[in-house]
Amino acid sequence: MENSTTTTEWYENQIREDGCFCMRSMQKAPGYVQKLNWTEKEFTQGLTYIQLRKDNKPVGFIEYALGEQAWRAVHADGYLVIHCIWIAVTGLGLGSQLIQRCIQDAITLGKKGVAVVTNIDTSWAPGPEIFLKNGFRHVEDAPYSFQLYIYKLNQEHSDPYFPDNWVLRLDRFSEGLTILRTHQCPYLEIATHNVIEAAETVGIQPEIIDIRDRSQLMELSPTPYGVFHVICNGELISYHRMTPRSFAKKLTMLYSKS
């Protein structure tokens, strides 16, 4: 335990001992185990994972990485990049506390600032509101409602930026059904199985590409989200988990047009 107040405790980089905040009710599930292993490996590359507990119950977490090692498709060398932030108990300012901790780490480490990829259309990426409250500003947009927000510690520093070849990235997967996945999120194993189940009902065999490192992610990812994508005949179906039925419906519509 790093520090505590009377009721709120901070646990840093103890995911093996304290567990993952997400999917904690399914700790024997393959995705959960893969997340633990992935996170511990990324600790050696500068990843930070902080979990908050209130009265010994998990109430939120934040995960962030060095820009050079971030699992988001954004050029952010010299910055810290927030992967995820989630608060289960609102109204206590816990989310802002976690963001401010990340900013303080950026100062301590001599970084240019903090960057985060947001999206207003899904809960699988954070929304921008809490970052605006904490002094972040919007710098760039990408397809599928992704946006880049930054907190810059020195205005003379260059801004992070998105790649500019999103269409080309999708064109690489112009034939068949492709799943790009990582183990950064514990739900992605379930998401993958849902696609496979849906594909079987339509008579399609998906190709699964496991993204092993940042360089591969930066080369292949068709959105800033980076860690999970389903692409069918060059068209993005999803970058997050969906039910098998929803995937099957989309696949049927796409193949009926071809």
Regions found by a protein language model. Give the residues of each.
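A short, internal acetyl-CoA/4′-phosphopantetheine-binding micro-motif in the GNAT/acyltransferase core
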Residues: 83-92, 120
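Conserved acetyl-CoA-binding loop-helix of GNAT-fold acetyltransferases
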Residues: 92-107
